Structure formats: C-alpha cells, structure tokens
C-alpha cells in the first residue's frame, strides 16, 4: 500500500531567486530523502532543472546543519561530465534551494528495479563512467563521496552516469583519515564500520563501487540480509555468493573479488579498475581466444600470470587435484566445491556450491589452517592427502594467486578457466597449453619442459574451443 508523500510545496508553486531574478516553477516531485525533496523545476525560457529543497525546521541538530553547509560548499565547486552539476544555491527563512542538473532517466536503482539485472556490456559502460567521475573527485578535488550507491548514480537523457548527492561527502587532506561512520548499510566499507581507530579514506568509495558492480550484475546486493546487524556481520566476514544462474564472466568475478577486499590498501586503484578487462572487453573471452588461434595471432612466450602447473583426477576424493604456478594447491570437487591452500600454507580458501530454490550458488570462505571448521575438515584432509601424494618439488613463481572459475572435462584431459580469463588445456598425454591475454600469449609444455606450440597442438585447442562455443 503506497503512502502519500507530504509535499514541502504544492506542484505549481513558483520559487524566486531574488539575487538573479529567476523564477522556478515546480512541475513534479522527483524524489525525497531524510531532509530534502527534489522537484522538477522549469524557468520561463523552458529550461528544466532538478531543484533540491531542504526544509530548515526539519534539521534539529547542529551536526546535520553543518553537513548541509558542507554539502553545498563541496558540490558547488564540482565540474565534471560524470558528476551532477550544481548551478546555484539560495535560501529563504524556511528553505534551502539547490539548482541541479536534471538527469532525465532517473537513478540506476530504478533502472535495475525495472530490469531485474543488467547485461555485462551495459554494466561495464556505467562502471567506466562512474570510475571516471571518481577519479576526478579523488584525484582532482580530494573529495570522498562516502554514500556511493545505485540511488546516487543518476542517468541523463543519453544514459550517461552522473554521481550525485554529496550530503555525506568530505574533503580529504594529505594523509587524513575520517572516522565518522556513515553511508547506506549494504554499501558501507568494512573500515568505515569497524575501523574507527584507524579511520577511512578514498578506498571506502572503491568498496562501494564493488558492491554496485555486483548488484547490477546479480540483481541484489552481495551482503543483503533482512536486518542491518546481519548485513554488517556479512560485510565483516566478507561473506557473499556468486549465483551460478547469473552466468557471470570470469572478468566480472575477478574484478568484484579484487575490489571486495576487506583490506583497503589491497583494493585496486581506480586507474587499475579502468584498465581491467571487464571494462574493455567487447566479446566473450573464449571467442576472442578462438579467433586469435584461428588467425595465428598468438605469440609464444612465458606466461607471467598464475596458471595450472599440474592436475590429476583423484578418484578417492571425487575431484581434480591441481597445483598452480603461484604455489596454490587445490582440489576442485565433482560437486563444484573448491578448496585451495594459499602459498603461505597458513590459510585455505573454500568455495562451496549448494542448491537453493533450485539454483546453484557459491559461498566463499577463508580459514586459518589451525582453525579449520568441522564441516570442511574431511575436505581439508583430502587436500593434505593430495599434497603428500603429488608434491613433487614443483618450481613456483612469485605471482599473484588466481583461483579457478571452472573446470571442463574434455575428451583428452581438462580445460581450466582462471578468474583472469587465462585458460589451460591439460592433456592426459602430458601436453599442457596455457593461453593468456585472450589468446595473444601462449606457453606450451610437454611434461614440465617448454615445447613448441605446433600446428597439431594448435588444432587440438581449436577443436575443443569450437565445441565449447558451439561453432559450426
């Protein structure tokens, strides 16, 4: 049942800016917040704006009043294509008026509500524009937004993103940390919630961006629960799922996983995010690899990212044991569970697959080896068995560990898909082919030694990819 909104001013009311002798007629209500209402306003020439109206009698505390003045001071100085423009502010004895750029398509939360979830190519475009706006805010004017969410990302008539609502924003001086806990529950970074002693900075916006990406692709926020305390608990544990039915690309999973890191210093920079494959890809990565193989656009060389060094089916464990070049040992079980011992040998990452409401979802957990939960103790014993049996003194590299997204059984071995879109053909006859950079770089091995990527091996890889892609 809808609740009728009490309007601060009747539709049709004319607001006069006495200093500039400009009259604004209120045409309709666009939205409302805790202390403000936003109207479509039109001047005599026919130009339209969004007018944010704050009723002063509703502001009871000095702190809220100070935030209002701070919002106006910060927002009025901002000038960027991906930030909502504030043209003017003025006030009467009862109200404060902010004349803002009109975003005809509304906010991203409304778009998501209409569509359920968005396609990756559309999300990539929205995210790229948001990142460009954040680069301006963080690097050019030292402003941290602190309430980045779908409802504060607005769309103009051409569906370009504009960051708006700077009510919780702050200017960050060199090395400064803020300690005020603020934001919207689903989007708040863990250091804002739990790190008051150490404070927070620009990285809090990057965390919120990760939540936004996930929400646009999946349809619901990653830490969604019925009550706020449970949401905060999920954020603290960094406990979220990747629903299998959403069919997320490895690039999307990789970017989200990088951003949703509880350590703010380990999150990617905005510049790194802007160059990530998720924002630049134009076609399915397997199709691009296939095309590069078909047109001989692969260059042989050493792959400098993580990949599968060794794998073997372990019937006793009902899974595939594997070793990565980074030093990760893991088992990918037949029921889609994935248990990995990190290179430091101090902790494991556990991806658990289960069926909920007829759909398969994945849960990510991390545990110290001396505190393995009872429910995965047997799986961990299996991993220890695999390590004891097949640890043959492999040579590792100091590369960033990258987890396996998918394993596909092929006629002559396994096809591994890594989170960064590197793929590995591990053939039972001892040949292994590692394709990175969407097939532009290839390393071929026979046993553990480098080998030439000859036409026969190339042909085998092409045939397998043709089958995966359904090419004729």
Swiss-Prot record:
<feature type="binding site">
    <location>
        <begin position="30"/>
        <end position="38"/>
    </location>
    <ligand>
        <name>ATP</name>
    </ligand>
</feature>
<dbReference type="GO" id="GO:0051301">
    <property type="term" value="P:cell division"/>
</dbReference>
<dbReference type="InterPro" id="IPR011009">
    <property type="entry name" value="Kinase-like_dom_sf"/>
</dbReference>
<keyword id="KW-0498">Mitosis</keyword>
<dbReference type="GO" id="GO:0005524">
    <property type="term" value="F:ATP binding"/>
</dbReference>
<dbReference type="InterPro" id="IPR008271">
    <property type="entry name" value="Ser/Thr_kinase_AS"/>
</dbReference>
<dbReference type="Pfam" id="PF00069">
    <property type="entry name" value="Pkinase"/>
</dbReference>
<comment type="function">
    <text>Protein kinase required for the cell cycle where it is involved in mitotic exit. Required to form a bipolar spindle, the actin ring and septum. Functions upstream of the whole septum formation pathway, including actin ring formation (regulated by late septation genes) and septal material deposition (regulated by early septation genes). Behaves as a 'septum-promoting factor', and could also be involved in inducing other late events of cell division.</text>
</comment>
<dbReference type="Pfam" id="PF00659">
    <property type="entry name" value="POLO_box"/>
</dbReference>
<feature type="domain" description="Protein kinase">
    <location>
        <begin position="24"/>
        <end position="279"/>
    </location>
</feature>
<dbReference type="GO" id="GO:0005737">
    <property type="term" value="C:cytoplasm"/>
</dbReference>
<dbReference type="InterPro" id="IPR017441">
    <property type="entry name" value="Protein_kinase_ATP_BS"/>
</dbReference>
<keyword id="KW-0723">Serine/threonine-protein kinase</keyword>
<keyword id="KW-0206">Cytoskeleton</keyword>
<dbReference type="GO" id="GO:0005634">
    <property type="term" value="C:nucleus"/>
</dbReference>
<keyword id="KW-0132">Cell division</keyword>
<feature type="binding site">
    <location>
        <position position="52"/>
    </location>
    <ligand>
        <name>ATP</name>
    </ligand>
</feature>
<dbReference type="GO" id="GO:0106310">
    <property type="term" value="F:protein serine kinase activity"/>
</dbReference>
<keyword id="KW-0808">Transferase</keyword>
<dbReference type="InterPro" id="IPR000959">
    <property type="entry name" value="POLO_box_dom"/>
</dbReference>
<keyword id="KW-0547">Nucleotide-binding</keyword>
<comment type="similarity">
    <text>Belongs to the protein kinase superfamily. Ser/Thr protein kinase family. CDC5/Polo subfamily.</text>
</comment>
<protein>
    <recommendedName>
        <fullName>Probable cell cycle serine/threonine-protein kinase CDC5 homolog</fullName>
        <ecNumber>2.7.11.21</ecNumber>
    </recommendedName>
</protein>
<keyword id="KW-0131">Cell cycle</keyword>
<dbReference type="InterPro" id="IPR036947">
    <property type="entry name" value="POLO_box_dom_sf"/>
</dbReference>
<dbReference type="GO" id="GO:0004674">
    <property type="term" value="F:protein serine/threonine kinase activity"/>
</dbReference>
<keyword id="KW-0418">Kinase</keyword>
<feature type="domain" description="POLO box">
    <location>
        <begin position="307"/>
        <end position="392"/>
    </location>
</feature>
<feature type="active site" description="Proton acceptor">
    <location>
        <position position="147"/>
    </location>
</feature>
<keyword id="KW-0963">Cytoplasm</keyword>
<keyword id="KW-0067">ATP-binding</keyword>
<dbReference type="GO" id="GO:0005816">
    <property type="term" value="C:spindle pole body"/>
</dbReference>
<dbReference type="InterPro" id="IPR000719">
    <property type="entry name" value="Prot_kinase_dom"/>
</dbReference>
């Amino acid at each position: 049942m809808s609740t009728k909104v009490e309007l601060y001013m009747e539709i049709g009311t004319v607001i006069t800016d006495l200093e500039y002798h400009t009259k604004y007629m209120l045409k309709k209500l666009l939205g409302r917040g805790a202390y403000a209402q936003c109207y479509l306003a039109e001047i005599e020439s026919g130009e339209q704006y969004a007018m944010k109206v704050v009723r002063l009698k509703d502001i009871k505390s000095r702190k809220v009043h100070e935030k209002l003045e701070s919002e106006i001071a910060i927002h009025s100085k901002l000038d960027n294509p991906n930030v909502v423009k504030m043209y003017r502010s003025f006030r009467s004895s009862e109200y404060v008026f902010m004349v803002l750029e009109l975003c005809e398509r509304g906010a991203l939360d409304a778009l998501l509500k209409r569509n359920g979830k968005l396609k990756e190519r559309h999300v990539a475009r929205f995210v790229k524009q948001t990142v460009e706006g954040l680069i301006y805010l963080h690097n050019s004017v030292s402003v941290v937004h602190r309430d980045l969410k779908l409802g504060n990302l607005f769309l103009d008539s051409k569906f370009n993103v504009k960051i708006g609502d700077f009510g919780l924003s702050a200017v960050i001086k060199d090395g400064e940390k803020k300690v005020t806990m603020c934001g919207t529950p689903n989007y708040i970074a863990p250091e804002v919630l739990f790190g008051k002693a150490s404070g927070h900075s620009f990285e809090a916006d990057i965390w919120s961006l990760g939540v936004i990406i996930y929400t646009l692709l999946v349809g619901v926020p990653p830490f969604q629960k019925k009550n706020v305390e449970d949401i905060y608990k999920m954020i603290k544990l960094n406990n979220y799922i990747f629903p299998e039915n959403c069919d997320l690309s490895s690039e999307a999973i990789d970017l989200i996983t990088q951003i949703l890191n509880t350590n703010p210093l380990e999150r990617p920079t905005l510049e790194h995010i802007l160059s990530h494959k998720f924002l630049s890809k134009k076609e399915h990565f397997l199709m691009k690899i296939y095309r590069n193989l078909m047109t001989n656009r692969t260059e042989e060389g050493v792959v400098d990212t993580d990949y599968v060094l060794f794998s073997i089916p372990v019937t006793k464990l009902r899974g595939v044991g594997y070793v990565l070049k980074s030093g990760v040992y893991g088992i990918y079980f037949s029921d889609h569970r994935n248990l990995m011992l990190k290179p430091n040998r101090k902790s494991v990452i556990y991806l658990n697959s289960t069926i909920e409401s007829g759909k398969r979802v994945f849960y990510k957990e991390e545990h110290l080896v001396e505190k393995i939960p009872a429910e995965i103790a047997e799986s961990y014993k299996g991993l220890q068995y695999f390590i004891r049996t097949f640890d043959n003194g492999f040579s590792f590299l100091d590369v960033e560990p990258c987890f396996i997204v998918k394993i596909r059984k092929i006629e002559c071995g396994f096809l591994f898909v890594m989170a960064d879109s590197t793929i590995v053909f591990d053939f039972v006859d001892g040949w292994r082919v590692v394709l990175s950079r969407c097939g532009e770089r290839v390393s071929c091995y026979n046993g553990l030694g480098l080998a030439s990527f000859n036409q026969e091996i190339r042909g085998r890889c092409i045939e397998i990819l043709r089958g995966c892609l359904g090419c004729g």
